[in-house]
C-alpha cells in the first residue's frame, strides 16, 4: 500500500484520436510518443455500457486526467470512439477506448457498425479487457441486457472471458453507508447474476467524483489487478475475432501500398493522385466492413426484441408457468445466438473486396 501511495501522481496521458482540441486539458503530456521502445506493453481497454452510466468519467478516473468529455446527462455526450494512452506507475501503458452509447436503443445500427470498426482499429493488437460500466444510480434496463447480448453476438461468446463489471456511483453508496456487497444484496436482478457468473465475479466499484488522491489511486490499482487477472487467465493472449483480423489486414495492405508508391519516384502531383485513389479504396473497404457489422447489429436487435417480448408475456404467468417459460427463453436465446453467430461467420468468410 505504501508503494501505491508513493505512485499517486497523475499518469501522463496521450490522446490517440481527437477532433476537438478543447477536450484535452493542459495537464495531458503530448511529448510522450509511446513508441515501440517503451519498457512496458500497451494494453487495450474498452469501455462499454448504456449512455449515462459514467463510461467517460470512468475513463478519466483511469487515466487520471479529464480527457474524455463527461456530463451527467441522460442524453450522453460521447458520440464517437476515442482512445487515450496513459502510463501507469510501474505497470503497462493503458490504451483506454471510450465508446459512444453503443447498443443504446436510440442509436442506429449503421452508426454502431462504423463505430465498432473504428473501435477495433484503435485497439491495435486486440482487446485486453472489456469494462462493462453499470451505475448504482439507475436500475438495470433492457439496454444493459442489449449491451451484453450484442457484445456476445458481434464478438463471439468468448468475449465474456475478458469482461470486468465496473459499478459507478461509489459516492452514492458511501453516503448511504453501503458497500457494493450490500447494494447487490439478495435481490440482485437475474441479468446481473448471469453477467457476474459469466465474467467470473470480476467486479469493482468506482467513485468518479472523489477528490481523495489516495482513493483515486487505490481504485485504479484494484482495477489493474483485475486486468492482470484477465490477462493471466487468457494466457497473455488478447481478444481478437475475424472482423479484427480483416480490419488489420486491410490497414496493413493500405500502408504497404502507400510505402510502395512513395518509393517509385512519382512526381508530387502523380503521388498525390495515386494516394487519393488508395485512400478511397481503403475507405470503401472499411465501409464494407462497417456495413457487415450493421447487418449483424440488426440481427442482434431483432432477436433481442423478440426475447424481451417473450419475457414481458412471462410476467403475467403463474409461478410454474414462469419457470417453464424461463427455461424456454434460455433455450430460445441459445438458439438465436447460435444462428446469428453462424450467419455472421458465413458473411465474414465472404470476400469484401
Swiss-Prot record:
Biased composition (Basic and acidic residues): 12-34
Region called G3, residue ranges: 98-101
GO molecular function, one term: GTP binding
Species annotation: Arabidopsis thaliana
Protein name (Swiss-Prot/TrEMBL): Immune-associated nucleotide-binding protein 8
Inducing factors: Up-regulated early after infection with P.syringae carrying avrRpt2. Up-regulated by brassinolide, cold treatment, syringolin, P.infestans infection and, at a lower level, by salicylic acid. Down-regulated by 2-aminoethoxyvinylglycine (AVG), high CO(2), isoxaben, and propiconazole treatments.
Biased composition (Polar residues): 1-10
Keywords, ordered alphabetically: Coiled coil, GTP-binding, Nucleotide-binding
Amino acid at each position: 500500500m505504501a508503494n501505491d501511495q508513493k505512485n499517486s501522481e497523475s499518469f501522463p496521458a496521450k490522446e490517440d484520436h481527437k477532433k476537438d482540441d478543447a477536450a484535452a486539458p493542459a495537464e495531458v503530456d503530448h511529448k510522450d510518443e509511446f513508441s515501440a521502445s517503451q519498457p512496458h506493453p500497451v494494453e487495450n481497454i474498452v469501455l462499454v455500457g448504456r449512455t449515462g452510466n459514467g463510461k467517460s468519467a470512468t475513463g478519466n478516473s483511469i487515466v487520471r486526467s479529464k480527457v474524455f468529455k463527461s456530463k451527467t446527462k441522460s442524453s450522453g455526450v460521447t458520440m464517437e470512439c476515442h482512445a487515450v494512452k496513459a502510463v501507469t506507475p510501474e505497470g503497462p501503458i493503458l490504451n483506454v477506448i471510450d465508446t459512444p452509447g453503443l447498443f443504446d436503443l436510440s442509436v442506429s445500427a449503421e452508426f454502431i457498425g462504423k463505430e465498432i470498426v473504428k473501435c477495433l482499429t484503435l485497439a491495435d493488437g486486440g482487446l485486453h479487457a472489456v469494462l462493462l460500466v453499470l451505475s448504482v444510480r439507475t436500475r438495470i434496463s433492457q439496454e444493459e441486457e442489449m449491451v451484453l447480448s450484442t457484445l456476445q453476438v458481434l464478438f463471439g461468446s468468448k468475449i465474456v472471458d475478458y469482461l470486468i463489471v465496473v459499478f459507478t456511483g461509489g459516492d452514492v453508496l458511501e453516503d448511504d453507508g453501503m458497500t457494493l456487497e450490500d447494494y447487490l444484496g439478495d435481490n440482485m436482478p437475474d441479468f446481473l447474476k448471469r453477467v457476474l457468473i459469466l465474467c467470473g465475479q470480476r467486479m469493482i466499484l468506482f467513485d468518479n467524483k472523489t477528490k481523495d488522491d489516495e482513493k483515486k489511486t487505490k481504485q485504479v490499482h484494484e482495477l489493474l489487478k483485475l486486468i492482470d487477472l484477465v490477462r493471466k487467465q487468457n494466457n497473455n493472449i488478447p481478444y481478437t475475432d475475424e472482423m479484427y483480423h480483416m480490419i488489420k489486414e486491410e490497414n496493413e495492405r493500405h500502408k504497404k501500398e502507400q510505402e510502395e508508391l512513395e518509393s517509385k519516384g512519382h512526381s508530387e502531383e502523380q503521388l498525390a493522385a495515386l494516394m487519393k485513389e488508395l485512400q478511397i479504396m481503403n475507405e470503401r473497404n472499411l465501409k464494407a466492413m462497417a456495413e457487415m457489422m450493421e447487418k449483424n447489429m440488426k440481427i442482434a436487435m431483432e432477436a433481442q426484441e423478440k426475447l424481451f417480448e417473450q419475457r414481458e408475456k412471462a410476467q403475467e404467468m403463474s409461478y410454474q408457468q414462469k419457470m417453464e417459460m424461463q427455461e424456454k427463453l434460455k433455450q430460445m436465446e441459445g438458439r438465436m445466438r447460435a444462428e446469428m453467430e453462424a450467419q455472421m461467420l458465413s458473411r465474414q468468410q465472404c470476400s469484401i473486396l
